[in-house]
């Protein structure tokens, strides 16, 4: 049985989907774009966008009672792979600051993302 996850600490879904689903032992987030849930704003800086997307993922994971250290897989969608080093630095800082091991990850370049942002991140977390 699955349960929809909803939190005001991450942006509301902008389409017919939920922020995440709780499957009991597994949490799957929808892709989180770097919209600040309090202001609705988006930074132009790709490092700041990476950080905000990860904070939004974390908010969905925490709404299910888990934490960043429970994330076991992420998929990162970027508009420009030339930003790879900048994304990696922000990504590394986020997991280090949250005392979380680095999860498995895929990173793919895409033509376009919702709201023309530069990055979107989705995650899978496990309840242990």
Please state what every model-predicted region is:
Residues 2-128:
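Short, polar/acidic, helix-capping and beta-turn segments at strand->helix junctions
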């Amino acid at each position: 049985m699955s349960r929809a996850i909803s939190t005001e600490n991450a942006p509301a879904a902008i389409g017919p989907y939920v922020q995440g689903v709780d499957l009991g032992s597994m949490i799957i987030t929808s892709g989180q774009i770097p919209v600040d849930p309090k202001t609705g704003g988006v930074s132009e800086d790709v490092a700041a966008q990476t950080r905000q997307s990860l904070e939004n993922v974390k908010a969905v994971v925490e709404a299910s009672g888990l934490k960043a250290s429970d994330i076991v897989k992420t998929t990162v969608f970027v508009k420009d792979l030339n930003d790879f080093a900048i994304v990696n630095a922000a990504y590394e800082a986020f997991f280090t600051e949250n005392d979380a091991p680095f999860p498995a990850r895929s990173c793919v370049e895409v033509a376009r993302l919702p709201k023309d942002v530069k990055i979107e991140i989705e995650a899978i977390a496990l309840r242990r």
